Amino acid sequence: MIQTFNELGALREQIAQWKREGLRVALVPTMGNLHGGHHSLVTLARQYADKVVASIFVNPTQFGPNEDFSRYPRTPEADVAGLEQVGCDAVWLPSVEAMYPLGVDKTTQMHAPGVSEVLEGASRPGHFDGVCTVVARLFLQVQPDVAVFGRKDYQQLAVIRQMVAELSFPIQIVGADIVRDEDGLAKSSRNQYLSAEQRPVATTIHRTLLGMREGYVAGQARDRIEADATAALQAAGFQVDYAVLRTPELAEPTFDGGGRVALIAARLGSTRLIDNLEF
C-alpha cells in the first residue's frame, strides 16, 4: 500500500530506514494533476531504484504574475490513487509553509545562469529560478539516489542537470521520453484547458516539429526552417513564443551537422503549450 507523507520528519524517517536496508531511492517531482506521462516517470524510476517517492507540490515561485497558479488543478486524491496503481511507494505532499517557511516572497532563491535565461526563461522571467529553488529543496528533503524528469520540459531538464553538476548533488538525473496521445499531442496537464474545437488544432505543434526535422535533414537553412514553422503555427491560429532549432545544449548552432532539438512554445487561445523533438 502506498504511503503518504505531509510531515517532513516522518518522510525522512522512512527514507532513512530504506537506506539502512541498502535500498536505492528515486524521486519523481510533480505538481500533481497527474496523467499517463507522469505515470511513465514512475515506471521508469522503478528501473533505477528499489523505492520510488513522488512529490506533489504546486510551486508558486515558478509561476509568473499573469500565469495560472490559482487556476492550476489540484487533484491529490486521484493523483495518489493513480500513483499507487503504477507502483509508487510513497507520496510527499508538502504545504507551501513547509516548503517556504520564511514565506514565498522572502525565500532564498536559486539561479542557474545561461541555460535558464533563453527560450522559456526569456518568455517567463524567473520561472527557472523557481524550478531550481523547489527542486533543490526536494533533493535535500528526500535525498534520492536518482531523480526522473520528463523530456517534454527539455529546457527544465537541462537547467536541473546544470544545477546538479555545479552543486555536486550526488544524484543521478534521468530524462524520460515524451508520452504522446495517438494523434501526436504531448500529454500535458494543460491539455484539459483546450476546447473541443482547439484539441485537434493543437496537434499542429507535433506536425510542425516533424516538419522542422524534415527541413534539417533536407539541408534547409535554420532561418528558413524556423520561419516556416512559425508561419505554419500562426496559420493554424497559434500565438507563437518561439519555434527554434538548437543544439542539445540549447545553444544556437554555429555549424551544420550534429544533433539538434526543435523546440516550440505557442499559445492556442489562453492555453500555452510546449513541445520538442530531438534528432
UniProtKB/Swiss-Prot annotation:
InterPro entries, per database record: Pantoate_ligase, Pantoate_ligase_C, Rossmann-like_a/b/a_fold
Molecular function (Gene Ontology), one example: pantoate-beta-alanine ligase activity
Gene3D superfamilies per record: HUPs, Pantoate-beta-alanine ligase, C-terminal domain
UniProt EC number: 6.3.2.1
Top enzyme class: ligase
Subcellular location: Cytoplasm
Ranges in coiled-coil conformation: none
Cellular component GO terms, alphabetical: cytosol
Record-linked CDD domains: PanC
Record: residues binding ATP: 31-38, 150-153, 179, 187-190
Function noted in UniProt: Catalyzes the condensation of pantoate with beta-alanine in an ATP-dependent reaction via a pantoyl-adenylate intermediate.
Name assigned to this protein: Pantothenate synthetase
Lineage of origin: Bacteria, Pseudomonadati, Pseudomonadota, Gammaproteobacteria, Lysobacterales
Chain's gene name: panC
